[in-house]
């Protein structure tokens, strides 16, 4: 069962908990009574979403949110909020008068499911969904750790 930390009883809306049958070997999170889905679009459902015990109604894998619209990649700029991160997207803007480019960036708040572990500097892929709050309209669908992106490139070493 999920950790009950809120005042309201946390449960998944599509799972019936008061079954009269004795569920031998059916533990929540171990293939038992847990709802999860594939969001499609080429993204795999994380193992933590299938086997975990968290309850998150805004999670695209275990909740009632569908991913539709834009798919955007960026870098995690801040992970200080509860289940929400700030994704920074850097881009170049052309200034016609000077025939040059200037650096710009945009910050996008995105909901992150408890099935992901993210730190500042990690690359994330976010998908658009319905408005989850006043400012959040995106959901994290994939996390690429910061070390793995540079693993293919050989670092300079002075021999």
From Swiss-Prot:
GO cellular component: cytosolic small ribosomal subunit
Subcellular compartments: Cytoplasm
GO MF annotation list: rRNA binding; structural constituent of ribosome
Keyword annotations of the record: Cytoplasm, Ribonucleoprotein, Ribosomal protein, RNA-binding, rRNA-binding
GO annotation (BP), single: translation
Similarity field: Belongs to the universal ribosomal protein uS17 family.
Protein name according to UniProt: Small ribosomal subunit protein uS17
Organism: Zea mays
